[in-house]
């Protein structure tokens, strides 16, 4: 389907046009992106190499880190480049590609967090059947399903926006291509289209978030049946999951579970779930996880020994 448009490229307005402020933001976002890449790559490598991190929880955690790597890379490099070089133009096709990648991995993360909550539920509420229920092929299927869910969500978003007429202006008041800022530039009535976007994005996020809250409520209720040591370990694991869920879902729900319009605060909220959350996820999951930190230390020592011999 060929897009009906006159606009061939867009201009991303970004955060500021002040050169001094752009330099400060460049350093800040570059640091955030480096920390995101290092932290998430470290988790992927550690889980892949370590023999002690073979449980489904770490398999899904590595999958989450991989998603965060691609998700962050679909947005941050162009943002950093624009702040450094001052080139904020993006072609129509590149804008659509960014939109597709960002939503396929963002959608996949939504479903994967639901899968991780189910894994946590089985581990705490059905510990004797955990290894039977969460067999390797089941984990692979659940991971694939989360990716398929993200793919379908992204295809639907792209199919909504791709064929719409963009007659001008071409200035996007944002730092990346997203649905609501793009709909603002469409030269036709977008009320019905906005409702579809809300249903596919905001409503889906809200339903999954409510399911997650219910599942964690059941898990917390089940903690009273565990020993004090088991309760502390389970509470540590679940609190990490819940922190990540809140950090990711609350901004997403604010952005997409509302009428298709833009607000000045949107850029700041978008930074939180596109830049900050992918950077914080490795810290949240590793700082309170003794098994993960121990495996990372062993991997670090092994690298030091091999490099010195």
Swiss-Prot record:
GO terms for molecular function: G protein-coupled receptor activity; olfactory receptor activity. It is a multi-pass membrane protein. The chain crosses the membrane at residues 24-47, 56-77, 99-118, 138-156, 194-217, 234-256, 268-287. It comes from the Eukaryota. GO terms for cellular component: plasma membrane. InterPro entries: GPCR_Rhodpsn, GPCR_Rhodpsn_7TM, Olfact_rcpt, Olfactory_Receptors. Glycans are attached at residues 6, 87. It is found in: Cell membrane. This is Olfactory receptor 4A47.
């Amino acid at each position: 389907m060929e897009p009906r448009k006159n606009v061939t490229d867009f201009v991303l307005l970004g955060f500021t046009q002040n050169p001094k402020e752009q330099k400060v933001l460049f350093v800040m976002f570059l640091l955030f992106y480096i920390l995101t890449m290092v932290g998430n790559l470290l988790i992927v490598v550690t889980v892949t190499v370590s023999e002690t991190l073979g449980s489904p929880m770490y398999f899904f955690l590595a999958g989450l880190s991989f998603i965060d790597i691609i998700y962050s890379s679909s947005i941050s490099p162009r943002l950093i480049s624009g702040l450094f070089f001052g080139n904020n133009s993006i072609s129509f096709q590149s804008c659509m590609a960014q939109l597709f990648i960002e939503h396929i991995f963002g959608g996949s993360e939504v479903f994967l967090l639901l899968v991780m909550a189910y894994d946590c539920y089985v581990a705490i509420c059905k510990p004797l059947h955990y290894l039977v229920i969460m067999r390797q092929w089941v984990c692979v299927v659940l991971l694939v399903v989360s990716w398929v869910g993200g793919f379908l969500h992204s295809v639907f978003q792209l199919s909504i926006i791709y064929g719409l007429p963009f007659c001008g202006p071409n200035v996007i008041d944002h730092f990346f291509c997203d649905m609501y800022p793009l709909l603002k530039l469409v030269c036709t009535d977008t009320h019905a289209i906005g409702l579809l976007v809300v249903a596919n994005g905001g409503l889906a996020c809200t339903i999954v978030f409510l399911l997650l809250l219910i599942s964690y409520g059941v898990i917390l209720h089940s903690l009273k049946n565990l020993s004090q040591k088991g309760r502390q370990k389970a509470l540590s694991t679940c609190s990490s999951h819940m922190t990540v869920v809140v950090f990711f879902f609350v901004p997403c729900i604010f952005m997409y579970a509302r009428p298709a319009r833009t607000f000045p605060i949107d850029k700041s909220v978008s930074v939180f779930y596109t830049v900050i959350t992918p950077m914080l996820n490795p810290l949240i999951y590793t700082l309170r996880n003794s098994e993960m930190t121990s495996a990372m230390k062993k991997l670090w020592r092994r690298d030091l020994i091999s490099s010195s011999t």
